[in-house]
Amino acid sequence: MPLITRNVFIDTEFFVKANLDFGSRTIKSFEELCEKGELHHITTTIVIKEIERKIKEHIKEALKGIKNFRRKAIVLREYEDDNIQNLFKDINDNDIEAKALEAFSNFIENSETSILDMKNVDLNEVIEMHFNEISPFSAKKPNEFRDAFTLLALRAALNEGEKIYVISDDPDHKNFCDENNDFINVDTLSSLNRHAFNRHLRVI
């Protein structure tokens, strides 16, 4: 698959399914390709806020699990083994959350991400899409306003004839890409990374 464009948008759910691990090999490879100018990461203020919210929710759930474990394993505190005692060391919830958010912020900065706001989105068009069940809206998903705003913001940012890859396995995103020639759906980021990396090798 030859690269058609450098522009790449990554759906929020991709990051969630990747466990919000911004140090993973796939995300780090993408970051490196963006730094080299092989790819151009474009996102929106909505996606930024969504991911930050997801990070906070995941941290809260993880810390809850740790506290539940400690409550059930309280008998182990009597053992003087360092490995066991480490399980009961104090955890600063705010520090953990801050570090997780910092990892995301570093990814955005290192990949030289362009962040779009909603100023160029036509609210009337969003309303029409909603009531006419035009992707990303559907009968089963009538409340996809965040996705609609994001996709229309991306469309408004493209120059005439310019295209963008959309990394998502969401059926409604795929339908939107099918209905809009400038949007190219790719199921996985690793697949796009591979083609971009191969292109980079041919160039050098």
Report the location of each language-model feature.
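Active-site-proximal, substrate-binding regions of enzyme catalytic domains
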Residues: 2-162, 171-204
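Conserved nucleotidyltransferase catalytic core and NTase-mimicking acidic/glycine-rich helix/loop elements
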Residues: 166
